[in-house]
Structure formats: structure tokens, C-alpha cells
């Protein structure tokens, strides 16, 4: 038991250390690989939870923050022509785009918790989180784009796609079960008919 207790202590100490490190603003750190990894893990966990959420319900009715209406109206006021179904990274990361995004993001400082935390954002909303389909963005940028995708119906493709896959898998299993049941049930049924006829 002592050996197990010793191995658990560094893990819990490490977890506390990571939690403590993540509580500081990212600007206060250099390029510490451990910190970068902790941020990447947290961003990936957020992405996984969000993708499961939009896969399991109709995203059009999701509420991501208490101020979704404000985020959406201000986003569409400033970025009225921005395509949100398939994003162009230049419209998020170029110098001219950053000049336009910066004031928008700063409007939500103190309103949206962790508004500037790094978050993974899908470029093509009809696809999942893959290395090729993901860009790192501030959380408020993620919220603005994903709220627009949800309200404008673009994320529905994800839930429909997942439900179609589940339906195909379920139908395949039902057909297989029906074939097995028909084989065994058919023999029993024939036997019952013979007995009933005799």
C-alpha cells in the first residue's frame, strides 16, 4: 500500500500543479512545453465535449453561454458576410482579420468567462476535429462562430450524419438479428405447424 500511496502523491501533485498553472493568464508564460501541453489537453477535452453535444441533439436549440443572443447579434453586425460553414483561416488569422476581431473579442472581456482562452475550432463544420480541419482560436471567436453555425443550421449536418451512421449500424444489426431469428424461428414454426397438423 505504501508503494501505491507514493505513486499517487506525485500524480495528484502534478494535477494540482497543472490546475494551478492553468489558472494564470497565458500571457504570463513563455513557451514552456509542459504548459503548452496542458493547454492543448484542455482545448482537446473542450472540443470533444462540444462535438458530442452537437452530435447528440439538434444544435439549433443549443445555448452555449448566457449571452448567446448578444454574441450572435454583435458577431453578425461586424462579420455579416463571413461564411461560417467553411472557414478561411485568413479571415481569422491575417493581420487585417486580427484588427477586426480584436475589438469584437475585447467587448466580451468580463462578460464571457475565459473569453481569450485558446480553443479548437473546426474549419469545415460538416466534419469533426482532425488535425487538418482544426485551428486554434480564442474562446469568444469559437463561441461567435459556433453560435452562428448552430442558429443558421450548419451544425445540423453533424447530428444528422451521426444519427444516420447510428441508424445504419442499428439497421445492420436488426437485419442480422432478423435473419438469425428467421432461421431459428422458421424451423420452430415449421415444427409447430407439423405438430398442430398431426
UniProtKB/Swiss-Prot annotation:
The keyword Endoplasmic reticulum does not apply. Pfam families: PBDC1 (PF04669). Signal peptide: none annotated. The modification Phosphoserine is found at residues 126, 184. The keyword Protein biosynthesis does not apply. Residues 171-198 have a biased composition (Basic and acidic residues). Keywords: Phosphoprotein. Residues 163-198 are annotated as: Disordered. It comes from the Eukaryota. Gene3D superfamilies: yst0336 like domain. Belongs to the PBDC1 family. This is Protein PBDC1. The lineage of its organism: Eukaryota, Metazoa, Chordata, Craniata, Vertebrata. The gene is Pbdc1.
